[in-house]
Every structure is written in C-alpha cells, then in structure tokens.
Amino acid sequence: MLDSKLLRSNLQDVADRLASRGFALDVARIEALEEQRKTVQTRTEALQAERNARSKSIGQAKQRGEDIAPLMADVERMGTELSDGKVELEKIQSELDSILLGIPNLPHESVPIGEDEDGNVEVRRWGTPTAFDFEIKDHVALGELTGGLDFETAAKMSGARFALLRGPIARMHRALAQFMINLHTAEHGYEEAYTPYLVQAPALMGTSQLPKFEEDLFKISRDGEADLYLIPTAEVSLTNIVSGEILDAKQLPLKFVAHSPCFRSEAGASGRDTRGMIRQHQFDKVEMVQVVEPSTSMEALEGLTANAERVLQLLELPYRVLALCTGDMGFSAVKTYDLEVWVPSQDKYREISSCSNCGDFQARRMQARFRNPETGKPELVHTLNGSGLAVGRTLVAVLENYQQADGSIRVPEVLKPYMAGVEVIR
C-alpha cells in the first residue's frame, strides 16, 4: 500500500498521478477524515495531559487532608472520555486504512500514459512467425488428434475451464516446467522453492490480492480455524518468505523461483477464451520473485524480464514485449512489461508473462525490510515478480508453432532431454 505520510502531505499530487491509472481518489473524504482524526487526537492529548495533572494533584490534596472526592470524580470522568476518544480514533483510522488498502500503486514516471490496453507500447519483438504452407490447426484440434488433450473428460470431473493432459503432451507439459526451473536456477541465479498452495488471508493481504480481488480467489472455510485460500500464483507464497523480516543488506538481492499450480475463479472472464487452455481455473506456472534494495529495483525489472524472455528464445517462439500503460497495469505495480507469444491459430500475440516492479507497495503491507548499512536503520525493500513462464500457455504456443502438416508436433531441441527419446508427438 501507499505511504500514509505521502498521502497526507501530497494528497492532490497523489490523486493526479492515480487519475492516470483511471482511479478516482476520494480526496474530499480523506481530507474530512484527516481533519476529524487531528481534532480527536488533539482533544484526546489535551485531556490526557489534564487527567495526568489531576491525578498528581490527588496525592497532594490527600497529603493536605483535603476532600479528594471531586478530584477522583474528575479523573474517572476524564478516563471515560479518553476511552471514548480512543474508540473514535480507532474508528476513523480503520476507515482511513480501508481507503488506503483500496488505492493502487503510483506509476513510475517512465510508464506510458493510457486508459487501457490500447495505450500499451511495444518495446521490441523477437523472432518471425512461421509462414505455414498448410492449413494450421489450433492447439485443441492438435491435442485431440494426438490424444493428449481431453477437455470433455475434464469437464465431466470438474466443469468448464479445466483440462486433462495425457501421454507425450502431459510429458511435454512437465518438460516445459522442468526446463524453465533448470534455466532459472542454473543460469539466472534463482533459488528454487517449494511453497504451500494454501495460504491464509494475511499472506494475500501482503501481496495485494486481498481485500480488492477476493472474488478471483478460491476460498476454503473451516470451522474454528482461519480460512485458507488456494494461491492464484506462487508470487504470494514466494514474496511472503520475507514478510515481517529485517534482512541484512548483504543478503540482497534475493531471487526465488517456484513451479506451482495456480487457481483462479476468472470471475470477470465470462465468455472470454472459452475454448482450450488459454484461460483455466487451474494452470501451472513457473514464478520468479526478487527482493532488492530500492535503488536497484528498476534495473532488476529489466533483468527479470530478460530472464523470462530467455525461455521463449531457447524455445524459439516468436514474441513481443509491451510496456503496459498506466490504465492497464496491475494494482500493485510501479511498472510492468508483458511478454506476448505468437499463437498461429489466432494470428496474434497472446500474453504469456507479466513482469512487474512493485516498489515498496507490497513490502509496506508485509513489513519486509532491510537494514541500511549507512544509517543502521530498517528500510522497506522493493519486490518484483514475473512469470517465467505460464506453463499451459507455453504448451499451447509450442503445439501450434511446432505443428506439421499431418497434425504431428515436433519437440523443440531444448526439450528433447526431458522427453525420454520422443522427438515427434503423433
């Protein structure tokens, strides 16, 4: 979340910057609450000082043999008023905190200004889409032809937006995840982690999925115990490794990577991508998270994005990189690059990775800090996250870009060591 001090001291400037994201900050309400808070706090502090003085005078009056009953009554009355003032302050602060939790991050000055995805700016492209000399099939048809993709059986078990993978296609799905993890750990310096798939609300609060995006989550209610949520991304569990920690500066940067299933209700996706594996309730993803010093986070974003790009380059899949505009960025991001891979059957690029610098937005919620070696004082870290990559969508891209005229699929060179001798899926 944003720094409350920044909000109080630069309220209109913050509102103007948020407006570029299409977010209307209720300046009048915040100003009114701040005025109430100051009034109650000033009154409470004055009352506390007066009560302290009266309490002191009770002892003095007692020594002089005076009647202390009136003073005792005053002190008791003031105690009640102080309790009432504390309750009032807590109520005001609770509303301010609620407003603060609903405010998105401030965009970096380098982020393009725009209202929606039409305002995104293409940064670069890599590779050239194949010019097929036969009628291409989409991944659903290819999967059904080879017997490796079964949506009907999955729907019978679980309903819409689920897939059953079998045989060589299931192996390729696993191979992709193994290849990505091996690349990021061996060449990009990430530490592999295996994390819980179920987390409590504070973990999701820390990474900003809660309270704003609860409808996108799958929740498990338990009698007498804290509710649990299925993770929508391993970003949640990886980033929360540093929740509540004060790190030594020498430990930074921390770079974590995990392969996990992800679970999303897709509450706002009705009617979109209903065919195939593009948008699922359950999908696998390899997630990268970095925890860095504030001065290095923008440079780290470039490196994180390059790490995700390297997966696509080694798979020889054409892609492009977009700098997301202010109106299309995620809630917690300062700046985001999206990677979009070429999907031949759709004749367009589709998102396969989103790489974001969240600045200190998540760290402030989690109280994730490092000790500044120059001042000796704890300061908030910066956190970054990115898909490296979404495994299901990468499988879609491989199936379609490596298809042959007879409906078979060539195995990319970098995946062959993981495929037990299979070079063509038929």
Curated annotation (Swiss-Prot):
Subunit structure: Homodimer. The tRNA molecule binds across the dimer.
Name assigned to this protein: Serine--tRNA ligase
Pathway: Aminoacyl-tRNA biosynthesis; selenocysteinyl-tRNA(Sec) biosynthesis; L-seryl-tRNA(Sec) from L-serine and tRNA(Sec): step 1/1
Binding residues annotated for L-serine, in chain numbering: T233, A234, E235, E287, S387
Family: Belongs to the class-II aminoacyl-tRNA synthetase family. Type-1 seryl-tRNA synthetase subfamily.
Function: Catalyzes the attachment of serine to tRNA(Ser). Is also able to aminoacylate tRNA(Sec) with serine, to form the misacylated tRNA L-seryl-tRNA(Sec), which will be further converted into selenocysteinyl-tRNA(Sec).
Enzyme Commission no: 6.1.1.11
Gene Ontology CC terms: cytoplasm
Catalysis performed (reactions): tRNA(Ser) + L-serine + ATP = L-seryl-tRNA(Ser) + AMP + diphosphate + H(+); tRNA(Sec) + L-serine + ATP = L-seryl-tRNA(Sec) + AMP + diphosphate + H(+)
Cellular compartment(s): Cytoplasm
Transport recorded as keyword: no
Region (Disordered): 43-63
Molecular function via GO: ATP binding; serine-tRNA ligase activity
